[in-house]
Each structure stands twice: as structure tokens, then as C-alpha cells.
Swiss-Prot record:
<comment type="similarity">
    <text>Belongs to the DTD family.</text>
</comment>
<dbReference type="GO" id="GO:0000049">
    <property type="term" value="F:tRNA binding"/>
</dbReference>
<dbReference type="GO" id="GO:0106026">
    <property type="term" value="F:Gly-tRNA(Ala) deacylase activity"/>
</dbReference>
<dbReference type="GO" id="GO:0019478">
    <property type="term" value="P:D-amino acid catabolic process"/>
</dbReference>
<keyword id="KW-0694">RNA-binding</keyword>
<dbReference type="GO" id="GO:0005737">
    <property type="term" value="C:cytoplasm"/>
</dbReference>
<keyword id="KW-0820">tRNA-binding</keyword>
<comment type="function">
    <text>An aminoacyl-tRNA editing enzyme that deacylates mischarged D-aminoacyl-tRNAs. Also deacylates mischarged glycyl-tRNA(Ala), protecting cells against glycine mischarging by AlaRS. Acts via tRNA-based rather than protein-based catalysis; rejects L-amino acids rather than detecting D-amino acids in the active site. By recycling D-aminoacyl-tRNA to D-amino acids and free tRNA molecules, this enzyme counteracts the toxicity associated with the formation of D-aminoacyl-tRNA entities in vivo and helps enforce protein L-homochirality.</text>
</comment>
<protein>
    <recommendedName>
        <fullName>D-aminoacyl-tRNA deacylase</fullName>
        <ecNumber>3.1.1.96</ecNumber>
    </recommendedName>
</protein>
<keyword id="KW-0378">Hydrolase</keyword>
<dbReference type="InterPro" id="IPR003732">
    <property type="entry name" value="Daa-tRNA_deacyls_DTD"/>
</dbReference>
<feature type="short sequence motif" description="Gly-cisPro motif, important for rejection of L-amino acids">
    <location>
        <begin position="137"/>
        <end position="138"/>
    </location>
</feature>
<comment type="subunit">
    <text>Homodimer.</text>
</comment>
<dbReference type="InterPro" id="IPR023509">
    <property type="entry name" value="DTD-like_sf"/>
</dbReference>
<dbReference type="GO" id="GO:0051500">
    <property type="term" value="F:D-tyrosyl-tRNA(Tyr) deacylase activity"/>
</dbReference>
<keyword id="KW-0963">Cytoplasm</keyword>
<dbReference type="Pfam" id="PF02580">
    <property type="entry name" value="Tyr_Deacylase"/>
</dbReference>
Amino acid sequence: MKVLIQRVTQAAVDVDSITIGQIDAGILALVGVEKQDNRETLGRMAQKLLKYRIFPDSEGKMNLSLTDTGGGLLVVSQFTLAADTRKGLRPSFSSSAPPDLARSLFDEFVAALRAQHPNVETGRFGADMKVRLINDGPVTFMLES
């Protein structure tokens, strides 16, 4: 599993020109599910995402997590994150989970996040989405299982 997290002052996701998820200050998480991912992977990644310290403390150091700040979390599926780009000029998706498995694991990932954090919004799995954000910093990290 690959989760690209971005610290944002606001973010939203639209499907068919309708906003289906939005947050104020917090994290936008783009999620790519890979073939080898399982429930154990999901649990570890959910914990890491919620506890990863990317927000400034009173001294300006990145020392606070999303759990600490209580900020929003917008989770958007993005299968292209699982692409292998090491060879050639076209991405290979051979390591991406098949759509049915990816949907199931993505839904379980979101459920794990919601069980631990009160403010979780999502996009729509498999939909053509438009994501809007204001990246704060910019602060962006790739979390990998």
C-alpha cells in the first residue's frame, strides 16, 4: 500500500461537479492499494497515517499528528500510486490490486480510520474525481507498507 499524504489548509473532492467530501485543515491522503496488501497492512497504515507527526508544535517543529490536532482527513483512492515506473515510458500496473480487491481493502482502510478518528471524508472509489487542495508548507510524504 502506498499512501501519499499532504498537509492541507483545505481540500475537497468532486464527482460530476458535485463536492462529495471536503475538509478544512488536516491531511489529504491519496491511497494506492497493491496486490500484496491485506488487513494487517491496512491496520498498520491507518495507525501510521493518524500518528505521523507532520503538524507544527508551539515551537514550529513537526511534532504533532492528526490525532493530536483533531484535523480533517480526506481519503481518496488513486490506483496510479501503485504503478511501477522504473522501466520504459509507460507505467505498469502489474503490482496494483485488482479492482474488486482494491475496493474491498480501500473500504476496510477507511473503516479503520473512521474507528479511530472522528473527521474522515472520502472520494468515490473508481470514479473520475477532481481533487482540490491548498497544500500547507508544502508538506508531502509517501507512506509505504
